[in-house]
Amino acid sequence: MNTILAQQIANEGGVEAWMIAQQHKSLLRFLTCGSVDDGKSTLIGRLLHDTLQIYEDQLSSLHNDSKRHGTQGEKLDLALLVDGLQAEREQGITIDVAYRYFSTEKRKFIIADTPGHEQYTRNMATGASTCDLAILLIDARKGVLDQTRRHSFISTLLGVKHLVVAINKMDLVDYCEETFARIREDYLTFAEQLPGDLDIRFVPLSALEGDNVAAQSANMRWYSGPTLLEVLETVDIQRAVDRQPMRFPVQYVNRPNLDFRGYAGTLASGSVKVGERIKVLPSGVESSVARIVTFDGDKEEACAGEAITLVLNDDIDISRGDLLLAANETLAPARHAAIDVVWMAEQPLAPGQSYDVKLAGKKTRARIEAIRYQIDINNLTQRDVESLPLNGIGLVEMTFDEPLALDIYQQNPVTGGLIFIDRLSNVTVGAGMVRELDERGATPPVEYSAFELELNALVRRHFPHWDARDLLGDKHGAA
């Protein structure tokens, strides 16, 4: 066991008390990105090493692996802690997205180490989709490169609001303050084209030597700011989903016996309480929450991010892919939308093509109507194209086979994000983020027969405890 971990457990009074303390720590998900060979994997290895998160057997294996695959001579090659694929070690690059977990006294962390090579940009987008913060590494010798711009744009496109620009390999430029200042100015000039609500910070460091990673550097006394670890421990993450209206995509209908019917899923945004009136989309049927069931027992209220099962007071038709929201919320299903797309397939995306799309638990078919433009990553300008190539990013107009309950991605990533699936190979070929909604072709108002209206009025008059909805409620309100 890691001796530091053993000491922490002892200080907390045992394993159970230590685990409870861990559960109450805040969690930060972040990714490392940047151009190839900027030192992303080495930086993560340094963080794990300097925060004493490496076990004795891992350290022993690292010594052996450094001799066989290392690129740092007699020094430990810390990148080998995260470059686990054989191809990665042979080529000295990152290919897949590698996830690592560690914690300090202040916070828990999940790290996504993403590839720097352009052909693996799709892997980088996958890693960024769940993160709150991005560390953008820049080689102090090379400055801002195309991949730096590409990864910055993709990160912000996927909703990342906190960017830490880590100017790495300062040891190779003699810890020069002028080099740091020049790269900082270059990046800020580029960042003027990014969304204006970003939190951008700069840290000069050397992942190989450990300068300004977990401890202040004696070689850069001109820098008085926080270390990288201090930034990660103290950054205030405000998740938009906590402030958004309640959205609950149904992932599974749980029916273990005749006495229980629950709707399982993860609460995408907002909160829900027992007794609250809810509405089901696309049907529009209403009910109220009878129970909120979790692994640890029933709750009175659940918040965004919690995995729950909702039990309703009425037996109504709800299937996987339906969306539950507050009864007083208005969300009109749409068949047409403009989608920001990151294309991940060798075959280009072109108008006229059809794909399966998956949104939360909902799966349907969509047709590409037009490509408005492709983004030139070098200068973030828009250009007209006939198709979107591998790793291309652009704005695409789509039509769905059926109306979908969608949100704008920047407001709610779960109900505003989707993936494209090839219908023949079942391979994921693209990621989409809803930019604009067009309600053309949305579900038209329902016309009820005279018999249905009379029956509805009869039920509401004689059985008020059924809470039946007034089918003419909207028209009565207008009158």
Curated annotation (Swiss-Prot):
<dbReference type="InterPro" id="IPR044138">
    <property type="entry name" value="CysN_II"/>
</dbReference>
<dbReference type="Pfam" id="PF00009">
    <property type="entry name" value="GTP_EFTU"/>
</dbReference>
<feature type="region of interest" description="G3">
    <location>
        <begin position="113"/>
        <end position="116"/>
    </location>
</feature>
<feature type="binding site">
    <location>
        <begin position="168"/>
        <end position="171"/>
    </location>
    <ligand>
        <name>GTP</name>
    </ligand>
</feature>
<dbReference type="InterPro" id="IPR011779">
    <property type="entry name" value="SO4_adenylTrfase_lsu"/>
</dbReference>
<feature type="binding site">
    <location>
        <begin position="113"/>
        <end position="117"/>
    </location>
    <ligand>
        <name>GTP</name>
    </ligand>
</feature>
<dbReference type="InterPro" id="IPR027417">
    <property type="entry name" value="P-loop_NTPase"/>
</dbReference>
<dbReference type="GO" id="GO:0000103">
    <property type="term" value="P:sulfate assimilation"/>
</dbReference>
<dbReference type="InterPro" id="IPR005225">
    <property type="entry name" value="Small_GTP-bd"/>
</dbReference>
<dbReference type="GO" id="GO:0070814">
    <property type="term" value="P:hydrogen sulfide biosynthetic process"/>
</dbReference>
<dbReference type="GO" id="GO:0005524">
    <property type="term" value="F:ATP binding"/>
</dbReference>
<feature type="region of interest" description="G2">
    <location>
        <begin position="92"/>
        <end position="96"/>
    </location>
</feature>
<dbReference type="InterPro" id="IPR000795">
    <property type="entry name" value="T_Tr_GTP-bd_dom"/>
</dbReference>
<keyword id="KW-0342">GTP-binding</keyword>
<keyword id="KW-0548">Nucleotidyltransferase</keyword>
<keyword id="KW-0067">ATP-binding</keyword>
<keyword id="KW-0808">Transferase</keyword>
<dbReference type="GO" id="GO:0003924">
    <property type="term" value="F:GTPase activity"/>
</dbReference>
<protein>
    <recommendedName>
        <fullName>Sulfate adenylyltransferase subunit 1</fullName>
        <ecNumber>2.7.7.4</ecNumber>
    </recommendedName>
</protein>
<feature type="region of interest" description="G4">
    <location>
        <begin position="168"/>
        <end position="171"/>
    </location>
</feature>
<comment type="similarity">
    <text>Belongs to the TRAFAC class translation factor GTPase superfamily. Classic translation factor GTPase family. CysN/NodQ subfamily.</text>
</comment>
<dbReference type="Pfam" id="PF22594">
    <property type="entry name" value="GTP-eEF1A_C"/>
</dbReference>
<dbReference type="InterPro" id="IPR031157">
    <property type="entry name" value="G_TR_CS"/>
</dbReference>
<keyword id="KW-0547">Nucleotide-binding</keyword>
<dbReference type="InterPro" id="IPR044139">
    <property type="entry name" value="CysN_NoDQ_III"/>
</dbReference>
<feature type="region of interest" description="G1">
    <location>
        <begin position="34"/>
        <end position="41"/>
    </location>
</feature>
<feature type="domain" description="tr-type G">
    <location>
        <begin position="25"/>
        <end position="239"/>
    </location>
</feature>
<comment type="subunit">
    <text>Heterodimer composed of CysD, the smaller subunit, and CysN.</text>
</comment>
<dbReference type="InterPro" id="IPR054696">
    <property type="entry name" value="GTP-eEF1A_C"/>
</dbReference>
<comment type="pathway">
    <text>Sulfur metabolism; hydrogen sulfide biosynthesis; sulfite from sulfate: step 1/3.</text>
</comment>
<comment type="function">
    <text>With CysD forms the ATP sulfurylase (ATPS) that catalyzes the adenylation of sulfate producing adenosine 5'-phosphosulfate (APS) and diphosphate, the first enzymatic step in sulfur assimilation pathway. APS synthesis involves the formation of a high-energy phosphoric-sulfuric acid anhydride bond driven by GTP hydrolysis by CysN coupled to ATP hydrolysis by CysD.</text>
</comment>
<dbReference type="InterPro" id="IPR041757">
    <property type="entry name" value="CysN_GTP-bd"/>
</dbReference>
<dbReference type="GO" id="GO:0005525">
    <property type="term" value="F:GTP binding"/>
</dbReference>
<dbReference type="InterPro" id="IPR050100">
    <property type="entry name" value="TRAFAC_GTPase_members"/>
</dbReference>
<dbReference type="InterPro" id="IPR009000">
    <property type="entry name" value="Transl_B-barrel_sf"/>
</dbReference>
<feature type="binding site">
    <location>
        <begin position="34"/>
        <end position="41"/>
    </location>
    <ligand>
        <name>GTP</name>
    </ligand>
</feature>
<dbReference type="GO" id="GO:0004781">
    <property type="term" value="F:sulfate adenylyltransferase (ATP) activity"/>
</dbReference>
<dbReference type="InterPro" id="IPR009001">
    <property type="entry name" value="Transl_elong_EF1A/Init_IF2_C"/>
</dbReference>
<feature type="region of interest" description="G5">
    <location>
        <begin position="206"/>
        <end position="208"/>
    </location>
</feature>
